[in-house]
Amino acid sequence: QPRSVRQDQDMNLSKPSPEQTSELMIQAGWYQLEGRHLVFCGDTAAQVFAAWAPLVKLAIAVTGNDWAHDWLIDQAENVVVLPTAEYSDDKLKQLLKLLSKPGDVVMFPWLPSENMLTTAHKLGRTVYAGEENIEKCRWAIAASGLNVTAIEPNYVAELVS
C-alpha cells in the first residue's frame, strides 16, 4: 500500500517548489510521481534498481566516467549515452521526440538536470529513473511539480510487472 511522503502536513504536494524540497523529506528509496513515474533515490547500479527495470523504448544515460550499467543494453530498445558536459534540456527533448513517442516508457539512470522528469512527463512519456545523489534526486522530484508518493520496494515489483 503506497504511503504519502507527508501525510501529517497540509502542504500541497501536487505543486512543490524547489524552496519546499527540504520539506519533502525525500531520502533513499522509491517514489511514485503522479501515479505513473517511478524514481529511485539510490545507486542505480545496484541490483534493487536493475532487477525491476522494465523493458523501455529509450534509456538516456548522462554520465561522466562511472559506468556500471551494462544491463541497460538488455532493457532498452535504444540506449543513448551522453557525457555530462554535452547534456542540455533541449537535447533531451530532441532525443525523446526522435526515439520515443507518447505513452512509451523511458529510463534515466541518472538525473543530472532537475528538469528531466518534467520534460519527459510533458511529452507524455512514462519515466523509470534513479539518482544516487539524494540532493539531486530531491530537486528533480520537487522541480517536477508532480504528486509524490513514497512506496515500499516490494510494491515496485508489482508496478513494473
Task: Mark where each language-model region is.
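S-adenosyl-L-methionine-dependent nucleic acid methyltransferase catalytic domains
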Residues: Q1-S161
